[in-house]
Amino acid sequence: MNDKQKKPQKLKARLPRGFVDRTAGDIRAVNEMTAKIREVYEHYGFDPLETPLFEYTDALGKFLPDSDRPNEGVFSLQDDDEQWMSLRYDLTAPLARHVAENFNEIQLPYRTYRAGYVFRNEKPGPGRFRQFMQFDADTVGAPGVQADAEMCMMMADTLEALGIKRGDYVIRVNNRKVLDGVLEAIGLGGDDKAGQRLNVLRAIDKLDKFGPEGVALLLGPGRKDESGDFTKGAGLDKEQIDKVLFFVGITDYGESAVRLAELVAGTARGGEGVEELNFIGALVTSAGYGPDRIKIDPSVVRGLEYYTGPVYEAELTFDVTNEKGEKVVFGSVGGGGRYDGLVSRFMGQPVPATGFSIGVSRLMTALKNLGKLGASEVIEPVLVTVMDGDVEAMGRYQKMTQELRAAGIRAEMFQGNWKKFGNQLKYADRRGCPVAIIQGGDERATSVVQIKDLIEGKRLSGEIEDNASWREARVAQETAPEADLVAKVREILAAQAEDRKRAAYGFALPYDPAQVGDTDENA
């Protein structure tokens, strides 16, 4: 086969594994949700901050597995100056870098929120993506646990602002210092036990996955999974295991507080942690946040390896059906805690900090389950059709389109092949356009337009069976002077809105055509 006979190979359109395209509905739903979150954060006095998607890899701290080839866990590339850069793994490490780099200009305590995508170079799976959005809030430079208490209250207020009612969520609070006290009390204090302490932390982090029995094996000799793979345990004896399981198994802090205080009584750090938990509990209760909203709960174990003090988690308590058809509690949608060591990595001096992160995609799934998201109405644009292609006619069509837009009405002029008018109406139907504007030569000569109610027209064609019904129905197409274009379109859109409300609520609601397209919230 010669070169002339060879067909060029078509490039295959492929979405990279672990990534998703976001369509208009999802984008609008996220925007609706994040606007409500942002409003709560602003009311608490937090200010926005934006950091780049890339950071120097060494700024990511514990996520740097290999200084020569840092490509595990993060997406990395080497700059032209041979320095490694990585897509951010979370929003906290970039904040720490920003604070350290601008420490002399920042007013402490520094209260900030950030929203954006983070990236994980991990094996993708169902519901597990390599790019996802987080929404964080942090206070840097506030050493007192009142800052942690405020974070918990802000998390509760955020969930309620999104429509999640009390009883369907709880903010659970624990303290890393209490666990440190427990570990010291069972003989795992000191630098020489650091490795064993780390194994204990990793074991109890699996509590949700393996339950108390599985964690007991990981705390002791080790655990073999279904495939036969063996995970070596932390090597604790039965008495040590029982004390650790008592701590992470506490469900009623009030009933267990005395015994817990006795367990850590000989450790300064453990006693301090218990005092901090009690202080947080007293603060939130005084502010009107009872245990139905914010609960001291030592069973919160996620992130204890990372945090240095209080740790908190937002959990949704209602049931959903999983992929297997089983009823399960929805679970965590965000969490955080105190991380006093992260900023100080750059500073060489202690810089206290606390904050939390909301998993936007997971929370959006929860809100859709509750019917709290995506209900806001998005009206497709009015379509100004094109009957003639000369400059004068095109100018008129564009002028009409701009008049509608200036009045706050979504509008577009048809940009396809205008010579086949039927295709324009097909486009309008598939697009879901509520109204079409038509002006041919005859209409242009008398300065009028045809205004076609596409929603009513579709209903009439499907429902009306006799002439009497037709006469009683709303007019689906009418002629109007060009000067009345905006007013007539508003009138039709208002009538359509009333029809939608009547269909949704079962009764007619009054409407004011003058308010359609009005962008003033106080109108």
UniProtKB/Swiss-Prot annotation:
Signal peptide: which range, if any?
none
Q: Which CDD domains match?
A: HisRS-like_core (cd00773), HisRS_anticodon (cd00859)
Identify its protein family.
Belongs to the class-II aminoacyl-tRNA synthetase family.
State where the protein is found: Cytoplasm
In its UniProt record, a GO molecular function of this protein is: histidine-tRNA ligase activity
Name this protein carries in UniProt: Histidine--tRNA ligase
Q: What EC identifiers does the entry list?
A: 6.1.1.21
Keyword tags: Aminoacyl-tRNA synthetase, ATP-binding, Cytoplasm, Ligase, Nucleotide-binding, Protein biosynthesis
Annotated InterPro entries? aa-tRNA-synth_II (IPR006195), aa-tRNA-synth_II/BPL/LPL (IPR045864), Anticodon-bd (IPR004154), Anticodon-bd_dom_sf (IPR036621), His-tRNA-ligase (IPR015807), HisRS-like_core (IPR041715), HisRS/HisZ (IPR004516), HisRS_anticodon (IPR033656)
- HAMAP family, sorted: His_tRNA_synth
Q: Which organism is it from?
A: Rhizobium johnstonii (strain DSM 114642 / LMG 32736 / 3841)
